[in-house]
A protein has these predicted regions:
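Short, well-ordered beta-to-alpha junction loops that form the rim of enzyme active sites
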Residues: 131, 168-173, 214-216, 287-289
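Active-site glycine-centered loops adjacent to acidic/histidine catalytic or metal-binding residues
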Residues: 33, 65-66, 93-94, 170, ...
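Short acidic, glycine-rich surface-loop motifs adjacent to enzyme active sites
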Residues: 159-178
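Active-site-proximal beta-strand elements of phosphoester/diester hydrolases
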Residues: 25-38, 123-133, 166-168, 227-233, ...
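A short C-terminal boundary segment appended to hydrolase-like catalytic domains
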Residues: 255-320
Length: 320
Protein backbone atom coordinates (compact mmCIF):
# COMPACT_ATOMS: atom_id res chain seq x y z
CA UNK A 1 0.00 0.00 0.00
CA UNK A 2 2.83 2.34 0.91
CA UNK A 3 4.51 1.69 -2.45
CA UNK A 4 1.24 2.43 -4.22
CA UNK A 5 0.90 5.77 -2.43
CA UNK A 6 4.50 6.66 -3.25
CA UNK A 7 3.92 5.79 -6.91
CA UNK A 8 0.82 8.03 -7.03
CA UNK A 9 2.78 10.90 -5.47
CA UNK A 10 5.57 10.50 -8.00
CA UNK A 11 3.07 10.59 -10.89
CA UNK A 12 1.42 13.73 -9.49
CA UNK A 13 4.82 15.35 -8.99
CA UNK A 14 5.80 14.64 -12.60
CA UNK A 15 2.50 16.07 -13.86
CA UNK A 16 2.89 19.22 -11.76
CA UNK A 17 6.48 19.68 -12.85
CA UNK A 18 5.73 19.22 -16.54
CA UNK A 19 6.30 22.46 -18.44
CA UNK A 20 3.03 24.28 -19.10
CA UNK A 21 2.37 25.42 -22.62
CA UNK A 22 2.96 29.16 -22.82
CA UNK A 23 -0.11 31.22 -23.65
CA UNK A 24 0.58 33.80 -26.35
CA UNK A 25 -1.52 36.90 -26.92
CA UNK A 26 -1.34 39.82 -29.30
CA UNK A 27 -3.44 43.00 -29.47
CA UNK A 28 -3.83 44.83 -32.78
CA UNK A 29 -5.30 48.26 -33.51
CA UNK A 30 -7.00 47.90 -36.87
CA UNK A 31 -8.74 50.15 -39.39
CA UNK A 32 -9.45 49.98 -43.11
CA UNK A 33 -10.45 52.02 -46.13
CA UNK A 34 -9.75 55.46 -44.70
CA UNK A 35 -9.96 56.99 -48.22
CA UNK A 36 -8.24 60.28 -47.41
CA UNK A 37 -9.05 61.90 -50.80
CA UNK A 38 -12.79 61.19 -50.51
CA UNK A 39 -13.70 62.58 -47.10
CA UNK A 40 -13.70 66.24 -46.07
CA UNK A 41 -13.18 65.25 -42.42
CA UNK A 42 -10.36 62.75 -42.99
CA UNK A 43 -8.12 64.49 -40.45
CA UNK A 44 -10.71 64.06 -37.71
CA UNK A 45 -11.20 60.40 -38.58
CA UNK A 46 -7.56 59.36 -38.69
CA UNK A 47 -6.78 61.47 -35.59
CA UNK A 48 -9.59 59.75 -33.68
CA UNK A 49 -8.07 56.36 -34.48
CA UNK A 50 -4.52 57.32 -33.52
CA UNK A 51 -5.62 59.10 -30.33
CA UNK A 52 -7.61 56.02 -29.31
CA UNK A 53 -4.68 53.72 -30.05
CA UNK A 54 -2.32 55.83 -27.96
CA UNK A 55 -4.66 55.12 -25.04
CA UNK A 56 -5.35 51.45 -25.88
CA UNK A 57 -1.64 50.70 -26.46
CA UNK A 58 -1.98 47.67 -28.78
CA UNK A 59 1.14 45.76 -29.76
CA UNK A 60 0.92 47.34 -33.21
CA UNK A 61 -1.53 49.06 -35.55
CA UNK A 62 -2.38 48.17 -39.14
CA UNK A 63 -4.50 49.76 -41.85
CA UNK A 64 -5.91 47.32 -44.38
CA UNK A 65 -5.54 49.43 -47.51
CA UNK A 66 -7.13 52.28 -49.48
CA UNK A 67 -5.52 54.85 -47.21
CA UNK A 68 -4.40 57.48 -49.72
CA UNK A 69 -2.05 58.41 -52.53
CA UNK A 70 1.38 60.09 -52.28
CA UNK A 71 0.32 63.74 -52.52
CA UNK A 72 1.33 66.77 -50.49
CA UNK A 73 -2.36 67.40 -49.71
CA UNK A 74 -2.44 64.19 -47.69
CA UNK A 75 1.03 64.37 -46.15
CA UNK A 76 -0.33 65.75 -42.83
CA UNK A 77 -2.58 62.70 -42.48
CA UNK A 78 0.33 60.32 -43.05
CA UNK A 79 2.16 62.28 -40.33
CA UNK A 80 -0.76 61.71 -37.96
CA UNK A 81 -0.57 57.97 -38.72
CA UNK A 82 3.17 57.98 -38.12
CA UNK A 83 2.71 59.71 -34.75
CA UNK A 84 1.66 56.41 -33.18
CA UNK A 85 4.66 55.51 -31.00
CA UNK A 86 4.55 51.75 -31.61
CA UNK A 87 4.98 49.53 -34.70
CA UNK A 88 2.63 50.33 -37.60
CA UNK A 89 1.95 48.59 -40.88
CA UNK A 90 0.33 49.40 -44.22
CA UNK A 91 -1.42 47.04 -46.64
CA UNK A 92 -1.62 48.08 -50.29
CA UNK A 93 -5.19 48.56 -51.54
CA UNK A 94 -6.40 49.04 -55.10
CA UNK A 95 -6.93 52.81 -54.59
CA UNK A 96 -3.30 53.31 -53.54
CA UNK A 97 -2.56 53.45 -57.28
CA UNK A 98 -5.16 56.11 -58.13
CA UNK A 99 -4.22 59.21 -60.08
CA UNK A 100 -1.50 57.46 -62.05
CA UNK A 101 0.44 56.43 -58.92
CA UNK A 102 2.62 53.39 -59.54
CA UNK A 103 2.87 50.51 -57.09
CA UNK A 104 6.53 51.38 -56.62
CA UNK A 105 5.64 54.97 -55.68
CA UNK A 106 2.97 53.83 -53.23
CA UNK A 107 5.42 51.45 -51.54
CA UNK A 108 8.25 53.98 -51.38
CA UNK A 109 6.03 56.69 -49.90
CA UNK A 110 5.11 54.34 -47.05
CA UNK A 111 8.75 53.29 -46.60
CA UNK A 112 7.79 49.67 -47.25
CA UNK A 113 10.28 47.18 -48.67
CA UNK A 114 7.64 45.32 -50.69
CA UNK A 115 3.87 45.10 -51.14
CA UNK A 116 3.83 41.64 -49.53
CA UNK A 117 5.92 40.78 -46.50
CA UNK A 118 5.89 39.09 -43.10
CA UNK A 119 6.82 39.92 -39.53
CA UNK A 120 6.64 38.28 -36.09
CA UNK A 121 5.12 39.71 -32.93
CA UNK A 122 4.40 38.12 -29.54
CA UNK A 123 4.84 34.58 -30.82
CA UNK A 124 2.65 34.99 -33.91
CA UNK A 125 3.66 35.23 -37.57
CA UNK A 126 1.86 37.88 -39.62
CA UNK A 127 1.80 37.51 -43.39
CA UNK A 128 0.76 40.50 -45.51
CA UNK A 129 -0.51 39.72 -49.01
CA UNK A 130 -1.03 41.99 -52.02
CA UNK A 131 -4.21 41.29 -53.99
CA UNK A 132 -3.32 43.70 -56.79
CA UNK A 133 -1.31 41.38 -59.05
CA UNK A 134 -2.11 41.12 -62.74
CA UNK A 135 -4.15 38.07 -63.69
CA UNK A 136 -2.57 38.15 -67.16
CA UNK A 137 0.37 40.22 -68.51
CA UNK A 138 -1.53 42.88 -70.45
CA UNK A 139 -4.32 43.37 -67.91
CA UNK A 140 -5.52 46.95 -67.55
CA UNK A 141 -7.60 48.62 -64.86
CA UNK A 142 -8.85 47.04 -61.64
CA UNK A 143 -6.97 43.99 -60.35
CA UNK A 144 -7.93 41.43 -57.73
CA UNK A 145 -5.52 38.52 -57.92
CA UNK A 146 -2.49 36.93 -56.24
CA UNK A 147 0.00 35.94 -58.91
CA UNK A 148 2.39 33.02 -59.28
CA UNK A 149 5.46 34.84 -57.94
CA UNK A 150 3.66 35.88 -54.78
CA UNK A 151 2.16 32.39 -54.36
CA UNK A 152 5.68 30.91 -54.51
CA UNK A 153 6.84 33.35 -51.86
CA UNK A 154 3.80 32.51 -49.71
CA UNK A 155 4.52 28.77 -49.95
CA UNK A 156 8.06 29.38 -48.69
CA UNK A 157 6.77 31.51 -45.80
CA UNK A 158 4.36 28.77 -44.78
CA UNK A 159 7.03 26.10 -45.15
CA UNK A 160 9.43 27.78 -42.73
CA UNK A 161 6.75 29.04 -40.30
CA UNK A 162 7.01 27.88 -36.68
CA UNK A 163 4.39 30.16 -35.08
CA UNK A 164 0.59 30.50 -35.41
CA UNK A 165 -0.23 32.62 -38.47
CA UNK A 166 -2.45 35.65 -39.06
CA UNK A 167 -3.00 37.00 -42.59
CA UNK A 168 -3.68 40.55 -43.76
CA UNK A 169 -4.80 41.64 -47.23
CA UNK A 170 -6.91 44.38 -48.76
CA UNK A 171 -9.13 42.29 -51.01
CA UNK A 172 -10.71 39.31 -49.28
CA UNK A 173 -9.76 35.64 -49.60
CA UNK A 174 -13.04 34.29 -48.22
CA UNK A 175 -16.04 32.94 -50.08
CA UNK A 176 -17.66 34.79 -52.98
CA UNK A 177 -21.33 33.77 -53.34
CA UNK A 178 -21.72 35.45 -56.72
CA UNK A 179 -24.72 37.54 -55.69
CA UNK A 180 -24.32 41.14 -56.91
CA UNK A 181 -22.43 43.28 -54.43
CA UNK A 182 -22.03 40.65 -51.71
CA UNK A 183 -18.33 39.83 -51.77
CA UNK A 184 -15.30 40.84 -53.78
CA UNK A 185 -12.68 38.22 -52.99
CA UNK A 186 -9.59 37.86 -55.15
CA UNK A 187 -10.30 35.91 -58.31
CA UNK A 188 -8.19 32.94 -57.26
CA UNK A 189 -9.44 32.89 -53.66
CA UNK A 190 -10.42 29.20 -53.85
CA UNK A 191 -6.88 28.23 -54.87
CA UNK A 192 -5.29 30.33 -52.13
CA UNK A 193 -7.65 29.00 -49.45
CA UNK A 194 -6.82 25.44 -50.54
CA UNK A 195 -3.15 26.25 -49.97
CA UNK A 196 -3.99 27.49 -46.46
CA UNK A 197 -5.95 24.35 -45.64
CA UNK A 198 -3.21 22.02 -46.85
CA UNK A 199 -0.76 23.91 -44.64
CA UNK A 200 -3.02 23.58 -41.59
CA UNK A 201 -3.32 19.84 -42.10
CA UNK A 202 0.43 19.33 -42.48
CA UNK A 203 1.69 21.84 -39.88
CA UNK A 204 -0.91 22.30 -37.12
CA UNK A 205 1.70 23.85 -34.82
CA UNK A 206 1.87 26.85 -37.18
CA UNK A 207 -1.75 26.82 -38.27
CA UNK A 208 -3.38 29.76 -40.03
CA UNK A 209 -5.90 31.14 -37.54
CA UNK A 210 -7.47 34.06 -39.39
CA UNK A 211 -7.33 36.32 -42.42
CA UNK A 212 -8.33 39.99 -42.10
CA UNK A 213 -9.27 42.19 -45.06
CA UNK A 214 -11.01 45.44 -45.98
CA UNK A 215 -12.06 46.56 -49.48
CA UNK A 216 -15.83 45.95 -49.51
CA UNK A 217 -16.70 48.38 -46.68
CA UNK A 218 -18.65 45.49 -45.14
CA UNK A 219 -18.94 44.19 -41.58
CA UNK A 220 -18.66 40.42 -41.87
CA UNK A 221 -16.97 37.28 -40.55
CA UNK A 222 -17.12 33.66 -41.68
CA UNK A 223 -15.30 30.46 -40.78
CA UNK A 224 -14.28 28.28 -43.71
CA UNK A 225 -12.76 24.90 -42.83
CA UNK A 226 -11.37 26.12 -39.52
CA UNK A 227 -9.99 29.49 -40.67
CA UNK A 228 -11.70 32.79 -39.87
CA UNK A 229 -12.10 35.29 -42.74
CA UNK A 230 -12.95 38.68 -41.28
CA UNK A 231 -13.87 41.81 -43.25
CA UNK A 232 -13.19 45.07 -41.41
CA UNK A 233 -15.57 47.90 -42.28
CA UNK A 234 -14.37 51.20 -43.71
CA UNK A 235 -13.44 53.92 -41.28
CA UNK A 236 -15.47 56.39 -43.33
CA UNK A 237 -18.40 55.22 -45.48
CA UNK A 238 -20.17 52.68 -47.65
CA UNK A 239 -19.77 53.33 -51.38
CA UNK A 240 -23.22 53.22 -53.04
CA UNK A 241 -22.64 54.48 -56.60
CA UNK A 242 -23.87 57.24 -58.86
CA UNK A 243 -27.43 55.88 -59.00
CA UNK A 244 -27.75 56.63 -55.26
CA UNK A 245 -26.49 60.23 -55.41
CA UNK A 246 -27.49 62.35 -52.42
CA UNK A 247 -26.14 65.64 -51.03
CA UNK A 248 -24.87 64.41 -47.67
CA UNK A 249 -23.35 67.55 -46.18
CA UNK A 250 -23.61 70.86 -48.05
CA UNK A 251 -22.81 72.34 -51.44
CA UNK A 252 -19.42 73.62 -50.27
CA UNK A 253 -18.29 70.16 -49.20
CA UNK A 254 -19.78 68.64 -52.33
CA UNK A 255 -17.86 71.06 -54.53
CA UNK A 256 -14.49 70.18 -53.01
CA UNK A 257 -15.16 66.48 -52.36
CA UNK A 258 -17.16 65.33 -55.35
CA UNK A 259 -17.35 61.63 -54.45
CA UNK A 260 -19.09 61.97 -51.08
CA UNK A 261 -22.54 62.28 -52.64
CA UNK A 262 -22.18 58.73 -53.98
CA UNK A 263 -21.49 57.32 -50.50
CA UNK A 264 -23.34 56.73 -47.24
CA UNK A 265 -20.89 58.29 -44.74
CA UNK A 266 -20.62 57.16 -41.14
CA UNK A 267 -21.04 59.95 -38.57
CA UNK A 268 -18.22 58.58 -36.44
CA UNK A 269 -15.04 56.82 -37.63
CA UNK A 270 -14.98 53.04 -37.32
CA UNK A 271 -12.01 51.00 -36.08
CA UNK A 272 -11.34 48.13 -33.69
CA UNK A 273 -8.87 46.49 -31.33
CA UNK A 274 -8.40 42.78 -31.99
CA UNK A 275 -6.97 40.35 -29.44
CA UNK A 276 -5.80 36.89 -30.50
CA UNK A 277 -4.79 34.24 -27.97
CA UNK A 278 -3.37 30.75 -28.32
CA UNK A 279 -6.00 29.80 -25.73
CA UNK A 280 -8.19 29.56 -28.84
CA UNK A 281 -10.05 32.81 -29.25
CA UNK A 282 -10.19 36.07 -31.19
CA UNK A 283 -11.98 39.10 -29.75
CA UNK A 284 -12.88 42.30 -31.57
CA UNK A 285 -14.02 45.48 -29.86
CA UNK A 286 -17.20 46.89 -31.35
CA UNK A 287 -17.75 50.42 -32.65
CA UNK A 288 -21.16 51.65 -33.69
CA UNK A 289 -22.19 54.73 -35.65
CA UNK A 290 -25.04 55.89 -37.89
CA UNK A 291 -25.33 57.30 -41.40
CA UNK A 292 -25.06 60.95 -42.35
CA UNK A 293 -28.35 61.50 -44.17
CA UNK A 294 -30.62 58.71 -45.41
CA UNK A 295 -29.70 55.06 -45.02
CA UNK A 296 -28.83 53.04 -48.13
CA UNK A 297 -32.20 51.28 -47.84
CA UNK A 298 -34.10 54.58 -47.89
CA UNK A 299 -32.45 55.22 -51.26
CA UNK A 300 -33.41 51.80 -52.63
CA UNK A 301 -30.11 49.98 -52.09
CA UNK A 302 -30.48 46.17 -52.54
CA UNK A 303 -32.08 44.58 -49.48
CA UNK A 304 -30.03 41.37 -49.72
CA UNK A 305 -26.93 43.34 -48.70
CA UNK A 306 -28.27 44.24 -45.26
CA UNK A 307 -26.32 41.45 -43.58
CA UNK A 308 -23.06 43.08 -44.76
CA UNK A 309 -23.78 46.82 -44.99
CA UNK A 310 -23.93 48.44 -41.55
CA UNK A 311 -22.49 51.62 -40.00
CA UNK A 312 -20.57 49.56 -37.45
CA UNK A 313 -17.81 47.13 -36.62
CA UNK A 314 -19.50 44.36 -34.66
CA UNK A 315 -18.14 43.23 -31.31
CA UNK A 316 -17.10 39.60 -31.80
CA UNK A 317 -15.83 36.56 -29.94
CA UNK A 318 -14.58 33.85 -32.29
CA UNK A 319 -13.16 30.50 -31.24
CA UNK A 320 -10.65 28.39 -33.13
Amino acid sequence: MQRFIIAICVVLLVINCSPKKEIKKVRIGMCSDVHLPTMHDAEYRISSFIDSMKIAKPDFIVELGDFGIPDERYAPYFEIWNSFPGPKYHIIGNHEMDGGTSLEEAIAYRKMMNSYYSFSRNGFLFIVLDGNDKEYPDQKGYRSYIGAEQISWLKEELKKASEPIILFSHQGIGSDPGNPGERYSIKNADKVRALFEIHNQSKPESRIIASFNGHTHHDFAENINGIWYITINSMAYKWLGEEYEYLRYNEGVDKDFKWIKYTAPYKEPLFTVVEISTEGYITMSGKYSSYVGPTPWELGYPEHLKKFVKPQITKRFMEF
